[in-house]
UniProtKB/Swiss-Prot annotation:
Residues of the active site: 9, 82
Associated pathway: Carbohydrate degradation; glycolysis; pyruvate from D-glyceraldehyde 3-phosphate: step 3/5
HAMAP family named in the record: PGAM_GpmB
Site (Transition state stabilizer): 150
UniProt-recorded Gene Ontology molecular function terms: phosphatase activity; phosphoglycerate mutase activity
Family indicated by similarity: Belongs to the phosphoglycerate mutase family. GpmB subfamily.
Name under which the protein is recorded: Probable phosphoglycerate mutase GpmB
Enzyme Commission number, as recorded: 5.4.2.-
Xref: Gene3D superfamilies: Phosphoglycerate mutase-like
GO biological process: glycolytic process
Gene Ontology, cellular component aspect: cytoplasm
Length: 215
């Protein structure tokens, strides 16, 4: 059985400022750095062999903190990037016009053909995220990889493993530095292939999430 751990990056400056990041970038906040240290301690005893990360700065920094604790090298994987949000990237979510908000909702709610201008569809995201996960099956036998990616991207991956449409990720809350695990296995009691063992675990974190503070 192959066990693959999934970590969302730590809180970034644009997370805190409510700016749309997508494949644009901003550094981790002090809280984000702290979250990364906490999840690193959480997985320290899990015998992680590979840390594979999106090549964006916020995920790379999170991966660096985890790698230092786990003693692993970092592998960059562009297919783990966040959903490309096109012309809305870098914008504050509260500044969107009604038309722009319709674009954003269409891409996230599964509207056929939903796509922000110059951006990516949820189905395209699902294809590349699954390809990145499947590549883990080429690692040496006994490997226990950890993937560092993004909220929408990881939600899409976990949801599609469960047989849900790509846009169902909006029903799954994966907070900054939450920990999930998916396994590739063959069991007489479960579906063969990828299954979800756990999703969105935050028991290792010690501060409220942004969405809790902003209620």
């Amino acid at each position: 059985m192959l066990q693959v751990y999934l970590v969302r990056h730590g809180e970034s400056e644009w997370n805190a400022a409510r700016r749309i990041q997508g494949q644009s970038d901003s550094p981790l906040t002090e809280t984000g750095e702290h979250q990364a240290r906490l999840v690193a301690q959480r997985v320290k005893s899990e015998s992680i062999t590979h840390i594979i990360t999106s090549d964006l700065g916020r995920t790379r920094r999170t991966a660096e903190i985890i790698a230092k604790v786990c003693g692993c090298e970092i592998i960059l994987e562009p297919r783990l990037r966040e959903l490309h949000m096109g012309v809305l990237e870098r914008r504050n979510i509260d500044s969107l016009t009604s038309e722009e908000e319709k674009w954003r909702k269409k891409v996230l709610d599964g509207t056929p053909g939903g796509r922000i201008p110059k951006g990516e569809s949820m189905d395209e995201l699902a294809v590349r995220m699954r390809a990145a996960l499947e590549n883990c099956r080429n690692l040496p036998v006994g490997s226990r990889p950890l993937l560092v990616s993004h909220g929408i991207a990881l939600g899409c991956l976990v949801g599609t493993i469960l047989g849900l449409p790509a846009h169902a990720e909006r029903r799954l809350r994966l907070r900054n530095c939450s920990l999930s695990r998916v396994d590739y296995q063959h069991s007489p009691w479960l579906a063969s292939g990828w299954i979800v063992e756990t999703a969105g675990d935050i028991t290792h974190l010690d501060t409220p999430a942004l969405d809790e503070l902003q209620r």
